[in-house]
């Protein structure tokens, strides 16, 4: 990394939408056996090893996710990884919050949404996202984080 002290000042936010607190239990054929704690622990270690700070929030409530996105205007969040889960297909409000704060983000989905029910194939976020990763299970989060850190390092 070019400037480790700059990276340390850069914070990455991971947002997990509804029902992701049930990972490891809910439909493992689609979402895998990793728990949300497993995923967050690996992401925190990956970010720390590269000199970045990372925070994560899971909520089943749309307004809590929106309020956390709004906080990015004041807290120095440099990048967002978001798995909007079911809000992917329904939440214009969450989309508007991401558009308003202008923090780059990657949309992550554990399952391949394009191989599932038709209603899961529409996203209100993809056209705003720097990228979209789906169908790679929990590893998709790690790939998204690696790209976020590379993106932030290139901006330095």
Curated annotation (Swiss-Prot):
Instruction: Write down the superkingdom of origin.
Output: Bacteria
State the signal peptide span: none
Which keywords does the record carry? Amino-acid biosynthesis, Aromatic amino acid biosynthesis, Lyase
Q: Which residues bind substrate?
A: 83, 89, 96, 110-111, 120
Reaction equations catalysed: 3-dehydroquinate = 3-dehydroshikimate + H2O
Hey, where's the site called Transition state stabilizer on this chain?
A: 26
Nucleotide-binding among keywords: no
| Top class in the EC scheme | lyase
Residues of the active site are 31 (proton acceptor), 109 (proton donor)
Q: Identify the metabolic or biological route this protein is part of.
A: Metabolic intermediate biosynthesis; chorismate biosynthesis; chorismate from D-erythrose 4-phosphate and phosphoenolpyruvate: step 3/7
Q: What is its EC number?
A: 4.2.1.10
User: Which terms under GO biological process does the entry name?
Assistant: amino acid biosynthetic process; aromatic amino acid family biosynthetic process; chorismate biosynthetic process; quinate catabolic process
Q: Which GO terms describe its molecular function?
A: 3-dehydroquinate dehydratase activity
HAMAP family, alphabetized: AroQ
Instruction: Provide the function of this protein.
Output: Catalyzes a trans-dehydration via an enolate intermediate.
What is stated as this protein's family in its record?
Belongs to the type-II 3-dehydroquinase family.
PANTHER family hit by this protein: CATABOLIC 3-DEHYDROQUINASE
What is known about its subunit structure? Homododecamer.
- The name of this protein is 3-dehydroquinate dehydratase
Organism of origin is Chromobacterium violaceum (strain ATCC 12472 / DSM 30191 / JCM 1249 / CCUG 213 / NBRC 12614 / NCIMB 9131 / NCTC 9757 / MK)
Provide the gene name from the record. Answer: aroQ
């Amino acid at each position: 990394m070019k400037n480790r002290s700059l990276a340390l000042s850069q914070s990455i936010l991971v947002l997990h939408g509804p029902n992701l607190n049930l990972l490891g239990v809910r439909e493992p054929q689609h979402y895998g056996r990793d728990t949300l704690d497993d995923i967050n622990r690996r992401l925190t270690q990956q970010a720390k090893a590269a000199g970045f700070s990372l925070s994560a929030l899971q909520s089943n409530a749309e307004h809590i996710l929106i309020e956390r996105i709004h906080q990015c205007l004041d807290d120095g969040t440099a990048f967002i990884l978001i798995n909007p889960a079911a809000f992917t297909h329904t939440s214009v409000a969450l989309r508007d919050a991401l558009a308003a704060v202008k923090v780059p983000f990657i949309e992550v989905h554990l399952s391949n949404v394009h191989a599932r029910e038709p209603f899961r194939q529409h996203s209100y976020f993809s056209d705003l996202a720097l990228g979209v990763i789906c169908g790679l299970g929990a590893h998709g989060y790690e790939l998204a984080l690696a790209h976020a850190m590379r993106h932030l390092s290139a901006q330095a």
